[in-house]
Amino acid sequence: MMQRILAGFSALPGADQAYIISRRDGLVASVGKRGRAPMVEHATQIIQAMERLGQNKAVGRGLEFWTEGEEMLLVTRLSEDASLIVSGKKGGRIARWRHAVECDVEMLNSLMR
């Protein structure tokens, strides 16, 4: 079921990959184009930066992060331990990615337990 949900994310306009990483377990699941490895190290660094920023009381906890440009990336916290990453190329529609994630986040959380 988790692979099916991730496949749906990777089929979104402009998306190439969707994967879940965990602090404890590393790469949990991944779906994407052949020959393209998930950017686990890059995503982990972003998540760690979000956690450091969240230690500032004025900012609060970061639940989502996205970048747009030649490469697009959406990082969504699923739990304290796990995060979902959707990545792709220029021309992706972050708003559609975010909406799709929002619709399936509860299902993903239940599968992660």
Identify the residue ranges that each predicted region occupies.
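Acidic, low-complexity cytosolic segments
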Residues: 1-17, 23-113
